């Protein structure tokens, strides 16, 4: 589909417009403009409504458009190629041309990279346009984000999940109003030759550090190649890339006559059900539902996912609002999900397929979490994992309650009850978080340190309670996900506008601000703790203390092979001394982590460990009295 270069010269073109009477190719090919409705530019139509043609003068970088004549009473005019790999800057969007790009020209360096097991994933969510800004008011690009790869690897995460990167109808955007599903978003692409050379130097330095050959500026000339370069360098440095895709709705297409909306130019623009790709349904998710009852529309979306796998080496997908998709499309939506997941699993079995599904959000299509993650063979939708808000809600509520003072009620037991994700057979099927793009965007809920201390977001109270929240996330079962800036105590809401104050405040780290640098080191060490102890990435968890009066929680993580980890935390404003808890076995238990070591002086702790020699307690065979730092947590392992 779309425009594809042919070995030996020229390109084939193919587009779906079943009710059109004629489709012509127009553009500039080999420096020669070809326009109008002439026989040599007319495509031929097959029995399924697909139009195709070949032009031997077409080549890499050429600009093109399709001219579509609708049926009687319909309209005539240009349409962009729905499969265009890139859009041009020749005219302002949405009236721009498409660009012919080779899908396989990029010189990949990632042959040895393997997508991590789901249980071993630690995800970092970011927005390309604001994550790595170097000039105020100008969105950061795919190549700017490459410069942050060493930072991300030093943090310890092993998956990045950018918000949607395809072309949208309005910029700046979160990315959920997609217009051109196969084209990278304009603002994320570098076109200035001088800037390209600067980025090339960064890329080649990163490649040289890994003993890999350099690239040339021609290798990153296109936006298509720049996104490939981002994924490639991530893989070289051990980072998987999960793409966020939006198949539950299309963009609004306001004033965009060249979009997929009414692609074959049917006369009736009053009924979106006649628009070919869309329906008249809108759940308030940002645009019209896609016509998933149509096999060709379903295949278009499946082809889009395959495109990210084949041409961008995708390691997974976050599927936006699958609950909305199923509600609006009923049986056809269910069929689509099963076709999608089954096809992609056949092509790339290690691919993470993560559904944003909220049971009960739309009661008219009642499916359970287990239905969503059950395999296609067992009658399910076939997704591997889903977003899960149980732990997030419990932790955020507890932190907020604690901020009202030492006499306020704190539901610590809710955290304990949500350590294992409800409704799922396996913990690794839940992607858990404390913050994400939806939760902490401007005008929505506050970031964690603001929840923790509404009057001073960088106080000891804000930092210590935020450490507690991060500790619960990174020691609980599931796939933990961080949101950009969370790792260094970002307290500002985020926004898509590329201007302060709602950008990640990298200057706090560059100026060595204490609260930011200490919290960053805390996050790094806590992530390393998760890597050091496989039990923290396993399935087993047993909360054995959940005392709301004391604001104390304790839980056991273990592997059947014997890796035992005990986590004890509190949201009390006082340190607990001589606090008796159970331990799985008698003997010495080493304190391997203490959140109080990051910003408190003196540190309240257990002098490196405790001797569990007391009587059975909390369902264990031994016990010991420990110190639990105020608004903090400690972690013990055998040894």
Please provide the spans of the model-predicted regions.
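Structural signature of outer-membrane beta-barrel domains
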Residues: 73, 324, 360-362
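Substrate-binding/active-site clefts of carbohydrate-active enzymes
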Residues: 84-88, 105, 111-118, 127-314, ...
